[in-house]
Amino acid sequence: MEDSGFNIKYAKLFIKRAEEDLEVAKVLLKTNHYPDSVYHSQQCVEKAVKAVLILNGIIFRRHVVSGVFRNVIYEMKIEDSWKEKLLNLIPKIESLEEHWVMPRYPEPYFGELWNPLEEYTKEDAEECLKDAENVLEVIKDFLKEKYGLKQI
């Protein structure tokens, strides 16, 4: 693993990309591109979580991050209030993880064809966006307090 200066820079880049994904999700929602909005909400959360993992010495190249994130939360020496706030994000993270493939591709699914253009609704996109905003906000606040990352 690289030195902590490298990890801080790396984590900041992940947060910047998470912020961009969130903005893209908003634009796509406004233009009625619901599956793609859902996907970018998922990407926002994945990248925000990976920033925390990086600052804990973990480079994780998979899309399902909730389990590793949960373990890191339990291992970190942090105040109980932060532990609780971060653990409360897990259900939202797990819910969004379900959307890293499904919004992008039509697929055979239980004998039928899954068509994301027909399956994802405005309400789905709004809910995913709301969850992504919440997860990103809490993680950014945590990174500012725990790691002193003021400029993220």
UniProtKB/Swiss-Prot annotation:
Task of the protein: Putative toxin component of a putative type VII toxin-antitoxin (TA) system. Its cognate antitoxin might be MJ1305.
InterPro entries in the cross-refs: HEPN_dom
Name the record gives this protein: Putative toxin MJ1304
Upper taxonomic lineage: Archaea, Methanobacteriati, Methanobacteriota, Methanomada group, Methanococci
Keywords for this protein: Toxin-antitoxin system
Residue span, HEPN domain: 15-135
Organism the protein comes from: Methanocaldococcus jannaschii (strain ATCC 43067 / DSM 2661 / JAL-1 / JCM 10045 / NBRC 100440)
Gene3D superfamilies for the chain: Nucleotidyltransferases domain 2
